[in-house]
C-alpha cells in the first residue's frame, strides 16, 4: 500500500542517515522510484554484509579444518593407476562436491571422518569417507553418488593403506 511504502521510504532514509525533515528526501518527484532505489541500495548492502560474513566463516572453517585434519595433509597413495589423496581444504572439499555432484561439501565438519579423493590422471573418479575410529571406508561415491568402474579397486586401495592413516594419528 501507499502508506506502507511511505513509511518504508522514511525508514530507509533513516537507515542511510538522510535528513527526514528535508523535503528533498521526503517529497521526491516520484516516491515509488525513490523507494525502489533505496530498497535496491539496502539489498545490495545486505548482500555485501552476507558476503563478508561468508568470507569470515570460510576463513574460520579453513582454520578449524587445518587444526582437525592437518596431520593427514600430504597423505596420498597409488596403485599405479589410481591416486588417492586427502582433501586438504574446505574449498577443495566444496569443489569435490561440485565436480562430483554430491553432498560432500559439508563433510569438513565431521569430526571422526577423513575425506579422500580418488583420481586417474588428475580426473576425479570417486570420493571416499574413512572412519577415524575404525579406519574403514564408510562410503565411496562417484559422480552423482554412483559407483565408478573402479569402485571396488578404490576401496581395496584405501583398505590396503589404512595403516598410513592410523600412523598419522599415532604420530600426532
Where do the PLM segments sit?
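Glycine-focused motif/segment detector
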Residues: 2-172
Amino acid at each position: 500500500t501507499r502508506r506502507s511504502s511511505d513509511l518504508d521510504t522514511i525508514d530507509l532514509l533513516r537507515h542511510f542517515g538522510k535528513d527526514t525533515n528535508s523535503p528533498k528526501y521526503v517529497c521526491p518527484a516520484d516516491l515509488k522510484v525513490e523507494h525502489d532505489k533505496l530498497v535496491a541500495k539496502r539489498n545490495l548492502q545486505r548482500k555485501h554484509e552476507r558476503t563478508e560474513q561468508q568470507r569470515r566463516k570460510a576463513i574460520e572453517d579453513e582454520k578449524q579444518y587445518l587444526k582437525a585434519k592437518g596431520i593427514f595433509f600430504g597423505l596420498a597413495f597409488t596403485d599405479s593407476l589410481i591416486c588417492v589423496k586427502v582433501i586438504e581444504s574446505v574449498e577443495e572439499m566444496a569443489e569435490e562436491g561440485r565436480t562430483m555432484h554430491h553432498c560432500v561439501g559439508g563433510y569438513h565438519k565431521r569430526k571422526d571422518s577423513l575425506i579422500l579423493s580418488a583420481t586417474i590422471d588428475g580426473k576425479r573418479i570417486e570420493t571416499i569417507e574413512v572412519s577415524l575410529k575404525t579406519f574403514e571406508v564408510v562410503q565411496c561415491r562417484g559422480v552423482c553418488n554412483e559407483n565408478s568402474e573402479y569402485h571396488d579397486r578404490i576401496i581395496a586401495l584405501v583398505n590396503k593403506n589404512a595403516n598410513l592413516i592410523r600412523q598419522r594419528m599415532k604420530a600426532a
